[in-house]
């Protein structure tokens, strides 16, 4: 009986050690040491993979910054319609950050003659027209996203914005600054290629390139859906990219960098 008791005690001690060891391994695999920071960002696009992106970010416990524009979505509505209210509310609850991508997704064309800029809205009542914007008009265009986001979620966006296509000039950047919004572009290595042709730029090559080339402090850029790409990027690439970057020692920050709270 004494031997049986000793065997039982040894069994329980061994089991406890194994359990604790397994738990520790599991925890450490989810919280790798990080000594670098990358900033994931997403522009609205057609929103076709918006739910998938949110699902992956939540599962990986990673935060991102979303740049919003009232773009037409795959459902036939628009990204800042009430029909997307719950989506944006959930992202707020999860702790993501948000910036303006201009309300009507206005593309910079060229500088104007007297300190203005020529812009071409992609959406809205003046879509496709090349228009002259002074500082007040450009400020209104950037700020409309902020105002609409407050209506949808009760929370303002960060004081940041991103010009569609990343097309800017010193005059345009100054206009945003005067309005109180800092422009946020992306790194060369941070261009994740989800808007490129699928045949020429397949997902496996995009994943390999980004996993290798992204560097400390880089801002990445992808979309919540692209009309032209046949092979959707996010479902095939995003999660593995996050895992690969974690393995390389990256944490994930929020924009603007001055207000970044790193996630694992």
Show where each model-derived region lies.
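Solvent-exposed, polar/charged alpha-helical surfaces in well-ordered, non-transmembrane soluble domains
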Residues: 51, 55, 86-89, 136, ...
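Histidine-centered catalytic micro-motifs
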Residues: 97-105, 165-168, 221-224
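C-terminal domain-boundary segment and adjacent tail
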Residues: 31-32, 60-64, 74, 230-264
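Acidic-and-aromatic substrate-binding clefts and catalytic sites of carbohydrate-active enzymes
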Residues: 44-49, 70-83, 106-111, 160-170, ...
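Active-site beta->alpha N-cap acidic-glycine motif
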Residues: 30-117, 123-133, 141-159
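His/Asp/Glu-enriched short active-site or ligand-binding loop at hydrolase and phosphoryl-transfer sites
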Residues: 167-213, 249-261
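Bacterial N-terminal signal peptides that target proteins for export
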Residues: 2-15
